[in-house]
């Protein structure tokens, strides 16, 4: 089988946003050797919608740590909601971006990595509300997906069920933090490549070691 790299992430995860240039580069350089799959982790799934103000005080400090470690910069439109939570109408939930990813994979499963990164950019740089259908419209044009069909599927219980299946799978795998990368090399063998933010060179070394070990086991 072709080794498959599983990228477990959440659209609202700031560390995943910081990691997005790394995973984009891995995808670009290894897409001819590996299959890639993105799984949404369901990081924010409140029983009742909670305003951004619940987490804003924590994020006001934490985003600087992410910037310092990763070199990523958060956009002013996103930061406005973080520093003006009492004026924001945001109620974050991981559900809709996860459903959107499941719908997208019906069209372009091989491009799930760049799409996931684009969704994170839409939130953390452009300040788009991922619980709003309109947050995805510009990406439909980019990837050549018909609006009407996409939005019908976005509100279909079938794709909602697919998203929750991903949440359950991530939990079943014992993954509690994001980003996490796994490399599956056979039906019974997988390697944990990284847990949390990892720079490109460190990740590349771990990936090459895993591929080498898998090759030795197969021979």
Language model: regions and residue ranges:
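Extreme N-terminal starter segment of soluble prokaryotic enzymes
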Residues: 1-6
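C-terminal cap of thioredoxin/glutaredoxin-like
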Residues: 7-8, 12, 19-28, 118-219
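Structural alpha/beta surface segment adjacent to cysteine/selenocysteine redox centers
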Residues: 20-123
């Amino acid at each position: 089988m072709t080794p498959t790299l599983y990228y477990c992430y959440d659209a609202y995860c700031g560390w995943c946003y910081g990691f997005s240039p790394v995973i984009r580069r891995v995808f670009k350089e290894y897409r001819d050797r590996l299959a890639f799959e993105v799984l949404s982790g369901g990081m924010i799934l409140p029983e009742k919608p909670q305003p951004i103000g619940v987490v804003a005080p924590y994020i006001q400090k934490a985003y600087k740590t992410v910037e310092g470690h990763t070199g990523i910069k958060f956009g002013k439109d996103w930061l406005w909601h973080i520093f003006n939570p009492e004026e924001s109408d945001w109620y974050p939930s991981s559900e809709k971006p996860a459903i959107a990813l499941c719908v997208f994979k019906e069209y372009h499963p091989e491009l799930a990595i760049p799409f996931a990164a684009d969704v994170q950019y839409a939130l953390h740089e452009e300040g788009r509300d991922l619980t709003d259908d309109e947050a995805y419209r510009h990406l439909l044009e980019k990837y050549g997906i018909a609006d009407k069909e996409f939005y019908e599927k976005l509100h279909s219980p079938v794709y909602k069920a697919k998203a929750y299946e991903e949440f359950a799978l991530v939990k079943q795998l014992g993954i509690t933090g994001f980003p996490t990368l796994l490399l599956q090399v056979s039906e019974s063998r997988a390697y944990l490549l990284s847990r949390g933010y990892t720079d490109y060179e460190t990740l590349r070394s771990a990936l090459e070691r895993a591929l080498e070990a898998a090759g030795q086991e197969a021979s």
